[in-house]
Amino acid sequence: QPVAREQALALLDRVGLLAHAHKYPGQLSGGQQQRVAIARALALKPDIMLFDEPTSALDPELVGEVLKVIQSLAREGMTMLIVTHEMDFALSISDRVVLMENGVVQADIAPQVICSPLEAPSLQRIREFMGVR
């Protein structure tokens, strides 16, 4: 049990919540609860993490704290599959971007290709959808 507690505290520290280790879920904000969920998933030492709209239910002021944790995981080399509408964020941390429409893959490309209008003119519709000019 001391090892599990030590690991739990280390993971809470990793997601910026060590100071809240004594709190119950109802005492945490939505963003804090989401970060606890990330810490719990990390406890299993996964090879890949799936995030399905990790910020969709959060108040706008809490979105940044969750994205910061995910960005940190990306920098550490964690493989992640992220379903998101946070387009700028996805482009900034991704090695690959897969865009789907009506369940069909429209593109599976490097974010640099999306951000460069001179490359692949056929992606113009996708760029417009993502707000990339």
Locate the predicted segments by residue.
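Catalytic Walker B motif of ABC-type/P-loop ATPase nucleotide-binding domains
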Residues: M49-D52
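H-loop/switch region of ABC-family ATPase nucleotide-binding domains
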Residues: T84-H85
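Helical segment within the ABC ATPase nucleotide-binding domain
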Residues: G64-E76
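Conserved signature/switch motifs of ABC ATPase nucleotide-binding domains
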Residues: K23-G26, L44
